[in-house]
């Protein structure tokens, strides 16, 4: 009997990395509830997997579950304070929950990590717009477009503010 248990434990250990790899793959490649379940499984197996926290947070944002997304982005940041995508995502989730000031702090941190990131300038432009800081919003939307001319969110932002790109 003990030999059977030993063999079973060894087989379980051999299969564990493959199961984790499958969960991570689905977490990254799938969307919606399937991705959320896969990310949750990946995190059950490896609670320090920042990629799975960020991916699950993104899926929560897509579903409008901003409190859950903020919690996951925050955990990713706690584990790796250099994760640009976690600061960007959390900034957007804060904006969507009416916490633009907190979002602004995350956008500022993201720009410290990557000073010429079009996506972050676009996001900060939206945050400034929500805060009523029109001139700052215009400047950031223009900066985003200078870095990435196809940044539609910045074009739309300028149009809402009555400014040409």
Write out the residue ranges for each language-model feature.
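Register position in tetratricopeptide repeats
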Residues: 62, 96-97, 130-131, 157-165
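Helix-start (N-cap) detector for alpha-helical repeat units in TPR-like alpha-solenoids
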Residues: 50-51, 84-85, 118-119, 152-153
